Amino acid sequence: MPSITLTAGPIARAKNGVIGKDGTLPWRLKTDLANFRAVTMGKPVIMGRKTWDSLPRKPLVGRTNIVLSRDGSFEPKGAVVCEEFGEAVSIAREQAEEDGAREVCVIGGASLFDLALAKAGRIYLTDIDADVEGDVTLTPLDETRWREVSARAYPAGEDDDYPFTIRVLERR
């Protein structure tokens, strides 16, 4: 049986490390959102409560949604709730195996990315070529621990506020 890879992301970050502002994404990048959907479709996704709350439509269709929350009364429709990251990863891996998926995606927020980066085998990272104002930042990534396996650059345009590069990194 193939192993199930834990991934950090897809995650988009500005040059200054910003990943969010006021509970939303501080940019409009339709091309990146399409990539997010393509990468996560059919795979379990793990997110924190604030990320869940920020979703315009809940749950994310076609994916098992797992939400971390310490609030015992939190019962989101269409999601599994876990109190601990390890428990969420175990449940997600079991679900991935059942679904025939080969990855589990940790999709946010910042503290969950920090937890995921310690164990992830792959990172789906969108680097936005701009400094953006925001109130949530990603811990700087030590890229010496990772090797880039793909990168594709996109220009700013009608559907995308800024130029950006979608990258895939794998642990060395």
Which residue stretches match the model-derived regions?
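Flexible, gly/pro- and Lys/Arg-enriched active-site loops
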Residues: 2-172
